[in-house]
Amino acid sequence: MKKIIFTLLFAVVSLGTFAQFEKRTMYVNASLTGFGLSYSKQPGFCMNIEAAGGYFFADNWAVKGLIGWDHVDAANTFDMGAGVRYYLHNNGLFFGTGFKYGLTSAGGDTEVLHNVFLPLEAGYCFFLNDHVSLEPSFFVDMCFNHFKESTKFGLKLSFGYYF
């Protein structure tokens, strides 16, 4: 009898835990990368801050928009983009992709670069409670027009709020 009650209790708790990935759920998140957790061909200190918001248009599928700021040595890049995210069978593992436009300026009289990126991301969503999550992920931002100089990859840490 104890096994049956425990099994039923576990089933009910696990169903409620991942209701965050259901259709019509919205989320916002903020992420941070750099500090030695990412690599690009450009030398020097690097840091990236990004804010994103999304909407689950179907169970486990979300569409998102993002804005970000990337600092590498003396250059600053402002990003904006859109993409999709897929959560595997309500277990928290996710994959994402999209398109990102970046405007890079090193200040002064230097040339302004216009870059188009294909971001790829894979990570896991740890829920701290019913709404707040911690989302570590591995990312690759492939640059179409300056591949060798502007492509970067690394680890990203995000905090999300699902409502």
Tell me the role of every PLM-derived stretch.
Residues 14-16, 38, 142:
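N-terminal processing/targeting junctions
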Residues 28-59:
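N-terminal targeting signals for Sec/Tat export/insertion, comprising classic cleavable signal peptides
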Residues 143-150:
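A short acidic/glycine-rich loop-to-helix N-cap element
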